Structures are given as structure tokens and as C-alpha cells.
């Protein structure tokens, strides 16, 4: 194809072009169906594809559906608003569209027909152009368009039109062969450099995943250069001689090596390639690579888990789950076939140590993967054994748990050195095809240094000859895994047949006799201990990582002691000098290692006692052992040997205070069976009953507590009766056992804890007591009784005596953080009972602090104490004293208030207060001065008004007296009452005079008499009125 013109991205370009128009004009960026010249600018922008549907809301916008290719004409460089102007190549329309609805199609290399044909063909019926042009990813701008998923291209809606010619819906054979020929030519031209699929290896990983996972629609086109590793696809069809040695890569993975039997070791990329190879869509298959699903995780996936991988279609999830089940079945079938093949192989294979092979692995997919042990490749080269490394199909294989030892007939000769020998018992076990076909996988064989079987354990050989290279390898190689009854029968076989079987040796034969070195027996898993078929047989069990050095195991719950002879001790030291095991602290909670020879004693004990668990070469730690955190001390071999001679058991940190007498508390008389004819360093095996006695005698009791207890018991015996002394001794003994059975909690600095019960007389205790007196106290038992005691209070220490003649305190109560409350409604029965028995009518109680309180730690037992007294004054006195004592204010800690309003410091507040006081004083002085001025002004006004009022009053009085005299004179001279009443009424009318008022009767003479004159004006008015009425009166009298 020529590069001078633009190649179409999809077949849906410009379908409205007439037949006489050249196709090159249609595909040219200079051509625009609408005559717009803006199309010439579109060549500078990348191609976009619509990922969401958008309907235009205005005329100048552009409709697009998912999968539409958008040719950008103008971006938003001018406005920066996210709206681009482009052309939809499907509808050939131009307009504005939101760029967030589209995705950029990246460009990495000029298009090649080989790469274009490797993508999925999409042929559209919208054009009758050449199908080759319609099915390729095109143009310089979008040649290697890496789409997240190829589905949106297929879902692009089509525009219906009337076809001008017959539509070719299927690719013709001629075009297909032409495509193949062109691809071969381009392959020869590009053979110098790597294919373009590897160009994006260093680029965006998200884009490269889809780019590399697209399945070729034409077989044999996705090929690599000749120097890359040869691969082949499951659907490879060889085209010609040049492609016979070339294969199709899927996701960059060689599909020929994707064997479902090896699915456990697949990487996420290989899983993706496998499902693409099986015909699943790229989107679903790529989910395994996206979520990093390795082979081990794949085999553990269930149907519900596939939904978490964003595989939305249920049908696809179900088909993938069925494919996973097929892979599992292939693995199981291959494991059984390998076991059958090992049975029919030649005889010399049994003299070689086989590598791990595939077995029944269904259980391993359900659990977590154990940490990989040190492999054979990591062994030091100076051990005279260099194993052949196992050929792996990938150097960077994922870590996995090595399989148990089985005998693979196909890989044995190629991988194992012929001089490595195994014992005869392995040959017998190898013949049993059902040995490892069990619901559980056999335990992982640990490699050197093995934490489960230390090299220093004297399990090699009794001889003192230096070990041979085969013996060295037997210590370093993965040990043999025995399961179920085979393990037991193997040990029983040699314990019964070989009379020279040493108690500390697991080798049935020496080097000279048997000629085969036996690897040390591994510690099987914890739950594979029980042998239900034969109870009397010896079973070996232990946790994998819990076998300590010989002689250094902590005591189990039954306190079994391991025994050893002097010959075994010398051999043990020699073995430790030969092999040096690095120390490890994670395997510190080990189990007891008992001797195999003690099995006979255990069998003898069965006839006399109830059968117990037998000793074994690798005895497991008992479940009832509560000291799992005891750590084993690691030291040099010399110190270990010396400490081994001194004692046969290891003291844990919690038993450091035990003495030799405590350790030897169980005498031979108590345990007649446990003694053994051994050297002085051998210890007896103690049975359960005696071990309990010895443990109870070896409890952690401090000297101070023991002394206090002894003194208390002696004094109680002296001060009380015989029955009380016996009773008290029993109770004290019980409290001592409780104290020693569990460590006593740490006491704070309370006076009760510091001093304890004092030997002091009552009189001396009363001298410095805060309060003292007789009270009745309720007992603590179920049938509690009230007893009268003499109490003395010293701080928070409330002690009491049984009588005033006692020289030692009878009891003690620590009332720290207690509350003192009177007896309420719920305590009426207690109060009533105390009153009825004559112990006191007034009852109150002491309540201990709430559980969980930080101040709730007291020396005495926290419980409610009831007290009763005879009168109210005594109760108030005791309650007041107790309340004052229990008030606990810690002045060393600042008080934090819940008031959230911001405040100022104390010094600032004091300064502000002083200023405020000064301002207040000034303000008060000003107010006083102003008040004095106001008071003076008001006083002057009042005085002036008073004077005026007095003057007016005096004038009014004089006026009234004068008018009274005149009236009396007129009464004497005039006999008519109307005239006098008229004169009086006129006077009371404030100067208003009218004959009509008198005539109408509105004014009466009494008004003038009762009214007083107001002011000096009325005097003048009165005279005028008198003159007026005087003439009138004279005139009327004359008439009458």
C-alpha cells in the first residue's frame, strides 16, 4: 500500500460518494462532502473512537455511538472547554462533540498488512469497496490502535442506505490468499527488526495487554523473528516452508508449552494466553492477567470467584469454570498415571532419589501455600554432592510448595545422580501405588537445615566413622515422607526385628551391614499422629517446626523425662561436633523427645494402669501444656552437653526458681515403674499422678509470702480455739494454692499492700487512727453471719480486731476508691436481719470500684462490705470518716475542664481584673459626683417649690378666713339663704359668676364652703363678684 494517502480506519467512511469518483479522493483528507475546507486541518490530530453514546442537543453538535471513529478537525486549544470539532466517519457528519465521550487511538508505527491482518476482521456491509481495505486498521494516525476491548467496534450502529451494488458479506478465497501473500512479503522485509508487537513492551502496560492478546484470525500471520524462542499455537496452520518453524504467539506466550498438567506453575500471562487459545474472548481472558491470577490461584477459583474478576456474563463464567475443572482433572489423571508408571519402571530406579512429581493435589488448592524450603540448588558445593538442577520451563516460575516424594519413572534418570542411595524400606514403599493417594498431601520434605529434624540429633549411626558423601546427602536432601500406618509399621518393624536397635538411633543397619543410608525421619503434621488401628503400636508425631535439640525440650503436661545412657551421650556429643545446626528462635516451642526404648516400659505399664500415650522418637507436645511460650536456650555444643549431664530437662523461664529438691520431689516409692538402670544423668519417667503432686509442690511461691503465711497460721493457732484454727488453716491453705496457681496481680502503692497485717495492740492502733469503734460486719459466705469487730481506720486501711485484747489485726480491708452509701431499699433485708439479731439498727455499706476502673486495683478482694451500728451518730461519724478517706484527688495531674469556651491564662486574667477594677472605681467616682450635683439641684428645686407652696397656702388660708368673716356678717344682715349660697358658689367657681348657674341649681352653697381659695387672683375676683351680687342682692331685697 502507498503511504501518500490516508488509509481508512473502518469501512464506514464516506458511503455517499458516486461510483465515478475515485476512491483516493474519498479517502483523502482534503476531500469533504460538504465542501468544507476545515478537513484539511484534520490530518494533524490523532484519531478518536467513541466509547459512549452521545445525542446532539444543538444543530452544530455531532451524534456518535460507541465504536464510531471520529476524525478531529479542530481541538479545544482556543477555548479549553473539552469540546472538539470533528467528523464522524460512520455518518460523515461534522460537528462539535465532548472529547470525554471518546478515547484516543494511539499510534506507534506505520501500518503493516501483517499486523493489520492479525487483528479481528470486521467487515461492514455499508460499502462495496475492497474488503481488504475494510478489514484493516488504517492510516498513520491509528495503525496500531490499541483498544481496551474490541467489542465496541462491533457494536457501532449502522446507517441504512440503498446499496448500489451487491454487498459482499463474506471474504472471498481470492482476497484471503492475497492477504497471505502480502503478509509473507512484509514478513520477509521486516525480518531484520523485531515485530511491532514488541515495540510497546516498555510503554503503557494497560495498552500493551490488549495489543498482545488479540487472537489472529488468519493462522500463521502473527509470527516473530527467527532468533526468538520457537512457539506454536493450538490452531496453527503451516502456510509454506518459511513458516513451518514459526508459530503464533498469544500474549507473547509460547502456546506449545501451555500444558494443563503444569497449570499450577502458570503465570497470569500464560493463563490469559491459554484461555484465548481455547477460544474465549479477549476481554474475559485478559481479566486473569489484570487481576494477577497465577496458576495456584486459578486452581482454587470457584464459580462465585469469577464474578469478582469483572467477567459479567454468567455464561462465560460458567464455561471458564468448566475449563478450570478440566485442568484440575487433567492434573489428577496425570498424577495417577505417574504413580502407575513408577510401578512398571526398571529396578535400578529405586536406588535413586527422585525429585518431586505431580500427585493428587486437590487439597492443596484449598489451603494456603507454605513457604518454600531451601531447594537442592542452594546446597553448599563442598558437601561432595551437586544435584542436577531441575529443568524448568520458565526461569522465573512462581514459588510454590514442593510436592511430597514420589517416584517418577520419566524424570529419574535425567535428574538424579546414581550414587545416591536410599534404604530398602523405601523400595517396599515405592511399590505401593496407593501410598500417597490420600485426601491430604504428604508433608513437605524439609531441606537442610531442616527445622523439624536437626542434624545434631544422634539418629545417624552408632559408629564413629566420618559420614560418607551419601550420608551427608541424606542429611541435606529432602527427607522421606511417611503417611498413615506405613509410618508406624516401619518403625515397629525395626523395633521388633533388630535387637541392636538403639533408643536414640533411627538407623536399622550400619554402613557396613546394610550399605544404605537412611534419611532422618521427618516430623509429620500435627494431625497425622493418631493410629486408630493399633493402640499399642508406637506412633511418632510432632509439629513440623517444634523439635528442639535433644535433651532441651521443655516439660510437657505429663512431665515426661527423656532417658539416655552414657554411650548415647558420647555419641550425641560426637554427632553435634560433626554437624552444626544454625540456631533458630521460631522453633522454640518444641516438644518433648522421648526415647524409643521406653516403649517397652509403656507396654508394661498398660497391664497395671490405665493406658496412657506412648513415648516415641518424636513425641508431640501435649495439648494440655499451657506453657507454649517457653523458649529454649541456644548455646555452644559444649555448654549444651554439660547442661545435659546436669539435668535431663530444660527449665523454662517460669520455673527458674525451682530447686533440685523440688525437681526430685517425686520419690521412687511413689513411682516404682519409672526408675531405670541407667547412669546418674538419666531421669525417671514420671506418671501423671506423681507429676501433678510434684508440680503442685513446685509452684512459684516467694519467700515473703511463705513467711507471712506461716506466721499467720501460727498466730491463729495461738489466738483461737482448736476448731477455728483447723478451719482457718484449711482456708489459708486454699488461699495459698490459689495464690500459687496463678500469679497475683501487681498491687499499686496502697498502704494495705505495703504494711499488711500488723502485730499491734488495739490501744496503740487507736492512738493514730483517723476513726475507731465497734461495728458489726457481715460475713462473706453464703450463710453469712454478723460478727462484732473493733475497727480502726488509718488512711485507706480499715483493719479490725476480734477483741480489744488482740495483739494482731484480725483482718484488713483496702477501701481505696470505694464508695460509702447508706443501706437503701434493696438492702432492707440485710438491715432488717442485722437489727433483728441485735447487731445494729443503722446499716451502711462500702462499694468497691467498678470493674475496669484504673483505680480499681486493691489489695483485698473487691466486694461489698456491710456494716451496722447501734445509733445514728456512730453511723454518721463512720460514714464521714470513710468518705473523707475515699476522696481521691490527685493534685499532680492538672484538672481538664469540659468547658470549651476559649479562656485566658491566670496571670492575664489577674491583670485584666486589676484594670477592670480601676475602671470601675473611676466610673463610680464620676457617678457619685454627678449624683451629688443632681441631688443638690433637686434639693434646691424642692426647697423652692416648698416655699412657693407654703406661701400660697398661707395666702389661701388668710383669704378663706377673711371670706368666712364676711359671709358671717352678711348672714347676719341678710336672711335669704339664696344670696349667701350665691356668694359662696361664686367664690368656688374660680371667678366665674353667672346668675343662670344659681338659678338652675347646678351650684349649691355647700361647694363654696368646702372649697379652698387658690391663689391671690380669686381675692380680686371675689371683690368684683361681691360688688356685682351686692347690687343685685340689694335690688332683690328691695323687691321682696
From Swiss-Prot:
The keyword Iron does not apply. Residues 690-701 have a biased composition (Basic residues). The gene is BOI2. The modification Phosphoserine is found at residues 18, 24, 28, 450, 519, 523, 546, 652. One of its GO terms (cellular component) is recycling endosome. Disulfide bonds: none annotated. Transmembrane segments: none annotated. SUPFAM superfamilies: PH domain-like, SAM/Pointed domain, SH3-domain. Interacts with BEM1. Interacts with TOS7. PANTHER family: PLECKSTRIN HOMOLOGY DOMAIN-CONTAINING FAMILY A MEMBER 3 (PTHR22902:SF27), SESQUIPEDALIAN (PTHR22902). It comes from the Eukaryota. Disruption phenotype: Leads to the accumulation of secretory vesicles and impairs bud growth. Residues 43-107 form the SH3 domain. It is found in: Bud; Bud neck. The lineage of its organism: Eukaryota, Fungi, Dikarya, Ascomycota, Saccharomycotina. Protein involved in bud formation. Functions redundantly with BOI1 to promote the fusion of secretory vesicles with the plasma membrane at sites of polarized growth. Acts as an abscission inhibitor during cytokinesis in response to chromatin bridges. The keyword Cell cycle applies. This is BEM1-interacting protein 2. Residues 266-330 form the SAM domain. Residues 768-887 form the PH domain. Residues 495-505, 632-648, 943-957 have a biased composition (Low complexity). GO terms for biological process: actin filament organization; budding cell apical bud growth; endosome organization; receptor recycling; retrograde transport, endosome to Golgi; septum digestion after cytokinesis; vesicle fusion to plasma membrane. Its main location: other. It comes from Saccharomyces cerevisiae (strain ATCC 204508 / S288c). One of its GO terms (molecular function) is phospholipid binding. Residues 557-570, 600-609, 702-732, 1015-1024 have a biased composition (Basic and acidic residues).
